[in-house]
Amino acid sequence: MTVYHFVGIKGTGMSSLAQILHDMKHTVQGSDYEKRFFTQTALEKRSISILPFDKSNVKEGQVIIAGNAFPDTHEEIVAAKELNIPVHRYHHFLGDLMNQYTSVAVTGAHGKTSTTGLLAHVMQGAHPTSYLIGDGTGHGVENSKYFVFEACEYRRHFLSYNPDYAIMTNIDFDHPDYFTDINDVFSAFQEMALQVKKGIIACGDDEELQKIQAKVPVIFYGFGEDNDFQARNIQKRTDGTIFDVFVRNTYYDTFKITGYGNHSVLNALAVIALCHYENVDVEAVKHQLTTFEGVKRRFNEKPMGEQVIIDDYAHHPTEINATIEAARQKHPEREIVVVFQPHTFSRTEKFLDEFAESLSKADQVYLCDIFGSARENKGELTIEDLQKRIDGAELITDTTTDVLKKHKNGVLIFMGAGDIQKFEAAYVKEVQVAEK
């Protein structure tokens, strides 16, 4: 019996892939650092064993899958090579796995995870679908027709894939520690486009995506009239969003989604376009869109007394704009308060003015210290450089969260890609202690 051993199983993509193989009735185990990580819960539910790193974990007959974060000098990778066991890097293994199915890559600077989750949910309503989402969620079905997965542009990892279809949500400059400028980002997406085998579903409202060249049909979606799939007559309500879809200027159908903000309409439109192309029953699509509950760390909301707390992964100015817009649609009468932790010094420095502009759309802003990456030098930048660009912004630590209590009817959005959740947890604990 083949054992799949994951080196770095707690990584979001690795955890998802491990879940998929387990669901397909394979034997799966993995190793990682002992610090608890949010992806562990799904692994533990499946009784997938998580071991501390040790070269003795590697044994003959295993299939070794290594996370991209671990160098060839890692003790388990060295042990595998000493035993002449091939080591498969995560993205290469995933690229080979998807060839067994009709595969759909979801990529873009923003909206990948939400769109992947939505597409997987909708497709499941019509056909057996396996999926891998970048929030650490994976699900495998033995008789799958489709394989839906999130494909990341960072370090051009998505060039390991040759999917049947690709959804491209947008092209934007991010990851300044790797990409030099928007042209560098575009070149990565252009190269990816040439690897797609059947069709590309691209947001036609995005100026960069309009320039994409491909060997397969490119179907454009968006709000603009030149798009193949266009959303019109949009009704933004506090219980979701309703809109009409026109296909090449002909009315197709009316859809309701549970999401908020223009970005949620675009994500749904991409899914509708792909399903139309694959002849998925429109009634199934409509039903599934109304039952989608979202993905981890994307506008996850919970009430706490008179306040509402939202946990969100937004860590780029474009994403911050979208999250604040969504919060205002759902809670038009409430004060919008953002607690933001910038992620990486390189990104914060590159987009300092853009961060200030997007955060200023909230009614009140609290800033946490910058969450640095292990790969980077702190440099001269401090959180005060961002604070002085935002009127009324205050600094906050995980020991001073009690200041948030004064926003009695507020929507508190804890926002960031680092460890912002510890600030949220500290505040929740603060409130619970005060109530006793």
Curated annotation (Swiss-Prot):
Cellular compartments annotated: Cytoplasm
Listed InterPro entries: Mur-like_cat_sf, Mur_ligase_C, Mur_ligase_C_dom_sf, Mur_ligase_cen, Mur_ligase_N, MurCDEF_pg_biosynth, UDP-N-AcMur_Ala_ligase_MurC
Gene from which the chain derives: murC
From the UniProt annotation, give the residues forming the signal peptide.
Answer: none
Which family is this protein grouped under?
Answer: Belongs to the MurCDEF family.
Pathway annotation: Cell wall biogenesis; peptidoglycan biosynthesis
Q: Name one GO biological process term.
A: cell wall organization
| Pfam entry (one) | Mur_ligase_C
The reply on keyword Cell cycle is: yes
> What exactly does this protein do?
Cell wall formation.
From the Swiss-Prot or TrEMBL record, give the protein name: UDP-N-acetylmuramate--L-alanine ligase
Q: Which reaction does it catalyse?
A: UDP-N-acetyl-alpha-D-muramate + L-alanine + ATP = UDP-N-acetyl-alpha-D-muramoyl-L-alanine + ADP + phosphate + H(+)
The record's listing under NCBIfam families reads:
murC
Query: Which Gene3D superfamilies does the UniProt entry name for this protein?
Result: Mur ligase, C-terminal domain (3.90.190.20), Mur-like, catalytic domain (3.40.1190.10), NAD(P)-binding Rossmann-like Domain (3.40.50.720)
Q: Which GO terms describe its cellular component?
A: cytoplasm
